[in-house]
Amino acid sequence: MTNEEPLPKKVRLNESDFKVLPREELLQRWKQFEAYVQALENKYTDLNSNDVTGLRESEEKLKQQQQDSARRENILVMRLATKEQEMQECTTQIQHLKQVQQPSVAQLRATMVDPAINLFFIKMKAELEQTKDKLEQAQNELSAWKFTPDSQTGKKLMAKCRMLIQENQELGRQLSQGRIAQLEAELALQKKYSEELKSSQDELNDFIIQLDEEVEGMQSTILVLQQQLKDSRQQLSQFQQQIQTSGNRTPSSESKDEGETSGKDCGRILNGPSNGGSSHQRTHSSVGLYREGSSTEEDFSASPINEGKLPNHSEERTSRGGSSYMNQLSTGYESVDSPTGSENSLTHQSNDTDSNHDSQEEKPVSGKGNRTVSSRHLQNGLDSSVNVQGSVL
C-alpha cells in the first residue's frame, strides 16, 4: 500500500451492533477494520523507515562535524601553546634586557672611579658653564636693546632693516639675472662649439671615405701589378731557358748579339708590366729574333776565316750583355714592388735601354759577306721591335 492509495474507512462497532447484526455482516466489517489497521501499520512502518535513514545520515554528518571541530580544537590548542611559549620567551627576554639596562651599584661605582669618564664629566661641566654665561649675556643684550613702540631709535632701526631687506632682494635679483645671462652665453658658445665639432666630424668622415676609396684603388693596382709581376717572372724564366739553350748551341758572336737583344727585350718587358698585350708582342718579337739569330749562325758556320777572332769578341759581348741584363732585372723588380714609383722607374729604364741600344748600334760588326748582311737584318729587326714596344708603352 502506497501513499497515493486512499486509506480504507474506519469501521466502528458498538455492543448493540454485535447483538443486532448478523454474523456475515460482522465478519465483513471485521475484515474492513483489519484492512484499516493493516494500512495504518504499513504507513507507520514506512514513516519509521524514512525517519531511521534520515537520522542515520544526520548522525553521520554530526559525527563528521564533531571530528572537524575536534581537529580544529587541537590545532587551536597547539597554536595557543606555541603563543604562550613565545610570550614566556618574550617576557624572559624583557626581564633580561631590563636587568642589563639597569646597572648595579658596583657598575656605577666602577664608572665613577674611571678617570676617562671623570674627565668627560669635567668637560661637560665646563661647557655647561660656558653656555650658561653666553645665555646670560644674550639675555642682557636683548633687555638692553628693547624699546617701546613710541621710541625713535626703534622706528629708525626697523626702517633700516626694511631698507636692507629690499636691497638684499634687489641684489639677489641682479645676481640671478646676471647668472642667467652668463648661462645663456655659455649655452650659445657650447652650441657653436658643437656645430663646429659636427662640421669637422663631417669633413673627417668625407676625408676617411676618400682615403678608403684611394686605398681600394691602390689595393686593386697592387693586385694588378702583382699579377703582372708574376707573368713577367714567368716570361723571364722562359727567356732564361731560351738564352741557356742558345748559349749551348751558338758559341759565336751571333749568340752574344742574341743575348743582348733578348736582355733588352726582357728589360723592356720588366719596365712596362702595365700592359699585358705588349708583353705578349714582345715575346713573339724575341722569338722571331731568336730564329733570325739561329739562321745567321747557320750562314756563318761555313766561313772559317773569322774562327780565331770570334771567341774573344763574343766573350766580351756576352759579359756586357749579362751585366746589363742583371741591372735591368733588379731595376724592374724594384719598380714592380713599389707601385708609387713605377712610372719613374719605367721612364728611367726605357731611357737606359735606349742608350744601351744606341751605344751597341754604334759598335762596328766584324764580318764579311753574308755575315754583315745578316747582322744588318738583325739590327733592323731589333729597331723595328723597339719601335713597336715604344709605341705600345
Curated annotation (Swiss-Prot):
**Family recorded in the similarity comment:** Belongs to the fl(2)d family.
Instruction: List the biased-composition ranges (Basic and acidic residues).
Output: 254-267, 310-319, 354-365
From the Swiss-Prot or TrEMBL record, state where the protein is found: Nucleus speckle; Nucleus, Nucleoplasm
> Which GO biological process entries does UniProt record here?
mRNA modification; mRNA processing; regulation of alternative mRNA splicing, via spliceosome; RNA splicing
| Source organism of this protein record | Xenopus tropicalis (Western clawed frog)
Q: Where is this region: Disordered?
A: 240-393
Composition bias (Polar residues) maps to 272-286, 320-353, 369-393
Does Acyltransferase show up as a keyword for this record? Answer: no
The name of this protein is: Pre-mRNA-splicing regulator WTAP
GO cellular component terms, alphabetically, are: cytoplasm; nuclear speck; nucleus; RNA N6-methyladenosine methyltransferase complex
| Superkingdom as given in the UniProt entry | Eukaryota
Write one Pfam family the protein is assigned to: Wtap
Its biological purpose is as follows: Associated component of the WMM complex, a complex that mediates N6-methyladenosine (m6A) methylation of RNAs, a modification that plays a role in the efficiency of mRNA splicing and RNA processing.
Please give the subunit comment from the record: Component of the WMM complex, a N6-methyltransferase complex composed of a catalytic subcomplex, named MAC, and of an associated subcomplex, named MACOM. Component of the MACOM subcomplex.
Keywords in UniProt for this one? Answer: Cell cycle, Developmental protein, mRNA processing, mRNA splicing, Nucleus
